[in-house]
Amino acid sequence: MVLTKLDKIKDEWARLAGEYDRQTTRGLLTPRAAAFCKRTIRNLIGSDPKDVLDVGTGTGLLAVEIAKAGHRVVGVDLTPEMLERARARSTGEGVEVTWLEGDAMSLPCETGRFDVTVSRHVLWTMPDPAKAFTEWVRVTKPNGRVVWFDSTWVKRSSTGSLLAWARETALARALRSTLRQKPKEHCCHYDTSLEGALPFRDLTSVRPIVELLRNLGISDVVFKSAQGAAPWNGILERLRSRERYYSAWFTVTPELHARLVGKAAQ
């Protein structure tokens, strides 16, 4: 059987559901990141109860936090193994979230259903980001909002990389010797062919995203630094990280909604 790109993505995240859950929980539930998350939910979604879709919900951490803030939440993910953990999380937290299995580029949701559509670290996994944004607009109400969280990567010159490596290595050896910690690897390792099929993987700038959105007729987009969401637990991780976290959003005007809904139907 020949696996499609979507099959490969699904299989990879199914394999990594447990490790992803541990890393996400560990990172986003630090006091600094948790406070940032609550503040961001209040600022970007509001305090009045709303219908919110969490696309690529994973193990449901963001969806559950949004539900705890009083919103009506639906979480969609491609991977049953992720959703199994998401259901356990919402049950454990005592909040109601509707969990659906589905593709972020072809959502199992009706048109104009949600006041806000959110995603966290999902955009880079999309083989077709334009199709994904078109879908996210489709399921959002006119005058609603599309919000996403992601990161870019800092380029390093060869000299800068060498210095950073030397500094990190010396500090890492000292700390690991003291704390007996093992090096942490990134939880997701796609094969080379799949990585090459993801246009927004390892971006060093948001410019390609801005250009894509402009081509879709979306120009009034707000990007804001979200370093408060960085899942750092101490100086070692802070030194090692090259990620620069950001939040972004735009309003789905009635004109934009009508045009992209028509495009999605073609």
Where in this protein do the model-derived segments appear?
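Class I SAM-dependent methyltransferase SAM/SAH-binding core
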Residues: 53-55, 59-106
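Conserved class I S-adenosyl-L-methionine
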Residues: 1-48, 61-65, 85, 145-178, 227
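Core SAM-dependent methyltransferase catalytic element
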Residues: 216, 234-266
